[in-house]
Amino acid sequence: MIGWLQGRVLYKQNDQLLINVCGVGYELTVPQSVMASAQVGEELTVFVHHVQREDGQFLYGFSSFLQRQLFRELIRVSGIGPKLSIVILSGLTPEALIAAVRAQESAPFLRLSGIGKKTAERLLIELHDRVEKNDLFLCDESESSRAPIALSASEEAIQALIALELAPAEAELWVKKAQKTLAEDADSAALIKTAFALRLQGAK
């Protein structure tokens, strides 16, 4: 599963981003806070929620670990899917959402498109205990919960191969084989290219 990505923004529109990570384009659905910080041609790092279904794979990107965790709690609420969860996180900061749930205050939710009184009440009821019992939601977001700066070249290569539908163990195996044939300072692009070549050759 893809947990986070760092790459160059190629395209942005509405709630959709396309970023280039080591030559692989990833499409993500993101809240407006991420969209506002994304600039075409510049680097962007996001935490990712990766959904695999019969009709395809879907990626949702977030500015912090906390925001992603809130998304995961929101989609567990009855009747709240990924689309509406993105709307909620576009209209409320993580801190504002947590504060509203703790105070059982529906007004912030009612101001958002697609949320009526019954939905707001259901959100407050179902999220309350989860917010109160999860230490992540009981304290301010720390530096350690924000998106990390960079992956190592090998980690980037493994992640790219997994995105291309190799099993994690297989991706790691071929990247390790590639490392043995390349210089120690080989970048992720070289590792990906060599790993694919070795795999095609059936290297053992």
From Swiss-Prot:
Keyword DNA repair: yes
GO molecular function, one term: ATP binding
Region feature Domain III, mapped onto this chain: 152-204
Region feature (Flexible linker): 143-152
Major location (coarse): cytoplasm
Region (Domain II) location: 64-142
Comment block on domains: Has three domains with a flexible linker between the domains II and III and assumes an 'L' shape. Domain III is highly mobile and contacts RuvB.
Function description: The RuvA-RuvB-RuvC complex processes Holliday junction (HJ) DNA during genetic recombination and DNA repair, while the RuvA-RuvB complex plays an important role in the rescue of blocked DNA replication forks via replication fork reversal (RFR). RuvA specifically binds to HJ cruciform DNA, conferring on it an open structure. The RuvB hexamer acts as an ATP-dependent pump, pulling dsDNA into and through the RuvAB complex. HJ branch migration allows RuvC to scan DNA until it finds its consensus sequence, where it cleaves and resolves the cruciform DNA.
HAMAP family to which the protein is assigned, alphabetical: DNA_HJ_migration_RuvA
Protein name: Holliday junction branch migration complex subunit RuvA
Upper lineage: Bacteria, Pseudomonadati, Pseudomonadota, Gammaproteobacteria, Cardiobacteriales
